[in-house]
Amino acid sequence: CEEAKEYGFAAVAITPANVKYAAQLLEGTNVKVEAAIGFPLGSSTTFIKVAETKDAIANGAQEVDMVINVGALKDGLYEYVENEIKEVVKAAHPSVPVKVILETFLLTEEEKVKVCQMAVNAQADYVKTCTGFNGGKATKEDILLMKKAVDGKCKIKASTGIKSREEFEELLEAGAVRFGTSSGILIVNGD
């Protein structure tokens, strides 16, 4: 939280258990508290994700990043996945933006496009590449695919594996407008 304040980062991404403490540390700053819902595997039920969203917001979360249920998606339960996104969006909106985490490295191109379309249909604010928990990384190819799939109806957050200014700039140029990285200070300093 202190580094985010010092460097003016947009948000600090944390688990719901730490939202209240982070909100206290960031009170009076422009740095937002971003709660990871369904983290890390997205396998919680819709009911739990909605409850987690409401609880995080009540404790001071100003943004919500929800992990989709990748297993349900892989099983072809598209209606379930889209409904889950809609329910989390409904719990958060209109005051708290929602980012839908795809776990891009686990999905086919067709599945990535499908989830992006679900996020748009559910009126999510962003689609996001990865949690950083399961491996993988944000790639230029994924950002370009996601940008085409959302067609300007959602913003894009690149997250995971962004270690250098060069990688950051490549993803920015591809269409990402927000970034999740543990290397923010190095990137800001141009390293």
What residue ranges belong to the model's regions?
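Alpha/beta enzyme core
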Residues: 1-7, 17-156, 164-191
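Metallocofactor- and cofactor-centric catalytic cores in central/energy metabolism, strongly enriched
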Residues: 10
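Small/polar loops that bind or transfer phosphate-bearing groups
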Residues: 14, 159
